[in-house]
Amino acid sequence: MEQPMKPTVIITGASSGVGLYGAKALIDKGWHVIMACRNLDKTQKVADELGFPKDSYTIIKLDLGYLDSVRRFVAQFRELGRPLKALVCNAAVYFPLLDEPLWSADDYELSVATNHLGHFLLCNLLLEDLKACPDADKRLIILGTVTANSKELGGKIPIPAPPDLGNFEGFEAGFKKPIAMINNKKFKSGKAYKDSKLCNMLTTRELHRRFHQETGIVFNSLYPGCVADTPLFRNHYSLFRTIFPWFQKNVTKGYVSQELAGERVAMVVADDKFKDSGVHWSWGNRQQAGREAFVQELSEQGSDAQKAQRMWDLSEKLVGLV
């Protein structure tokens, strides 16, 4: 008897950290994972090391900092002929030590280009694929961060600066080099990351508003906890990479392992408990065994309907959708 096709999920940044262990958890649940990554050899190596069954994953190149790469990825995925049941926008870059911005292939500031604009285009292009999937329970999940949400303790820390999108003056002006900040003010690398993640959460809100009722697709964001040893911090001071995990494990008790964070991502993708759309899931930044997820309130900016609509309209122009 022919075996039914495994449900398919795309995970960006699945070669390390939360994305990799989210892929593992979903493979263990019987899913087929499209590992969307920049480095194909590295991705194959970690898939082999974790013992992923060969029929449980497909690796496709994706560089979110290059909009043409996003379009090529979507075309390559469609060649597989697999119905898309879920999309997880996990990949992110963080450059906390930069005094001057890095630029994407499209001449956008690299962290906003990768974390927000690349994912924004990917979500929009793959909406048709999610709609076409015959499964009734389809989900699009974007990872947020505590540092972009002032309703959580980690989001109240003012260093280097809190997220502030202004009125999107930088986006309005075209956001091309030398404009490096969404509000068109002086470049601050850590703030650029926070701004990009705030845009991620606004994107989730606007996806829900525009498409949930029509399509039934579940649109959510989540914060799986403080993964203090994540490769996201690879561009930070080596001393920070040593002290921060120790501090989270022994002082705040907020440390969450990459494995547990990946399991939490898989839960939001696959479990019936997480079928509500338009919410931000959190575990309260704690490792405790059996800790339950809850719907976390977002900041005023992250809950601002007008800001979400303006972000959407300007982002559509920046990625060439209009």
Curated annotation (Swiss-Prot):
GO terms for biological process: chlorophyll biosynthetic process; photosynthesis. PANTHER family: PROTOCHLOROPHYLLIDE REDUCTASE A, CHLOROPLASTIC (PTHR44419:SF19), PROTOCHLOROPHYLLIDE REDUCTASE C, CHLOROPLASTIC (PTHR44419). It is an enzyme of class 1 (oxidoreductase). SUPFAM superfamilies: NAD(P)-binding Rossmann-fold domains (SSF51735). It holds the Pfam family adh_short. Belongs to the short-chain dehydrogenases/reductases (SDR) family. POR subfamily. The gene is por. This is Light-dependent protochlorophyllide reductase. Keywords: Chlorophyll biosynthesis, NADP, Oxidoreductase, Photosynthesis. Disulfide bonds: none annotated. The lineage of its organism: Bacteria, Bacillati, Cyanobacteriota, Cyanophyceae, Synechococcales. It comes from the Bacteria. Phototransformation of protochlorophyllide (Pchlide) to chlorophyllide (Chlide).
